[in-house]
């Protein structure tokens, strides 16, 4: 628990220092890739029940889900992100929390969206976060996780704070150990940037 609190503090402080800049660069759904919008939209349309947007940042993906008719809430470690999201989208529920200690009632969620919000988890910390997601999702509920595709657990210098690559196979194995069954995955590389990946899974 102490290790997770230390990691949470590292991520929180890193994003808090750049919250305004981050929101300007990435805080509008119109700035997001069409592929991401389609992927998340299709996934959300198949979720029955409440969706928790974990690491919601500026709140734009939570708003996207709500606009599609989903019952969605956003949580984030960074109070400035939550304050900004609540101001921009006052009709949506946002709160400051981490996945590890968000007090999600057991089996209360239809789905969890973890869109690049687990990339800063260490290889030792990731299983605990996936297990926390599984506890919150009822059997048959869904998880969608986005991440950077690469060698399993390899750290890289993300612009905010250290992040970690995972291969589709490696992340799939992590998900299966946490109590999920993988439904599908996708990968892509654009403009010479880091490779991206996502996995959709169901709680079993």
Please describe what each predicted stretch is.
Residues 1-47, 151:
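Conserved class I S-adenosyl-L-methionine
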Residues 52, 58-101:
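Class I SAM-dependent methyltransferase SAM/SAH-binding core
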Residues 100-112:
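A short acidic, Gly/Pro-enriched loop at the edge of an enzyme's catalytic core
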Residues 110-125:
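A short SAM/SAH-binding and catalytic strip from SAM-dependent methyltransferases
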Residues 127-139:
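A short glycine-rich, Lys/Arg-flanked "PGG" loop and its adjoining helix->strand segment in the class I
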Residues 140-147:
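Conserved beta-strand signature within the Rossmann-like core of class I S-adenosyl-L-methionine
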Residues 154-170:
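Acceptor-substrate binding/catalytic loop of class I
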Residues 189-204:
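Core SAM-dependent methyltransferase catalytic element
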């Amino acid at each position: 628990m102490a290790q997770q609190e230390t990691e949470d503090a590292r991520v929180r402080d890193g994003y808090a220092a750049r919250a305004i800049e981050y929101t300007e660069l990435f805080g509008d759904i119109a700035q997001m890739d069409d592929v991401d919008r389609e992927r998340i939209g299709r996934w959300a349309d198949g979720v029955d029940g409440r969706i928790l947007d974990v690491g919601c940042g500026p709140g734009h993906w939570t708003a996207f889900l709500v606009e599609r008719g989903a019952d969605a809430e956003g949580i984030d470690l960074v109070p400035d992100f939550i304050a900004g999201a609540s101001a921009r989208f006052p009709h949506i529920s946002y709160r400051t929390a981490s996945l590890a200690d968000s007090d999600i009632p057991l089996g209360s969620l239809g789905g969890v969206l973890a869109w690049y919000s687990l990339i800063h988890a260490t290889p030792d910390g990731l299983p605990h976060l996936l297990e926390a997601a599984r506890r919150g999702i009822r059997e048959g509920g869904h998880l969608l996780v986005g991440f950077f595709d690469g060698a399993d657990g390899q750290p890289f210098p993300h612009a905010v704070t250290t992040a970690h690559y995972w291969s589709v196979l490696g992340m799939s194995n992590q998900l299966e150990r946490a109590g999920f069954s993988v439904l599908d995955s996708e990968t892509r590389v654009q403009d010479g940037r880091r490779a991206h990946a996502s996995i959709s899974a169901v709680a079993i």
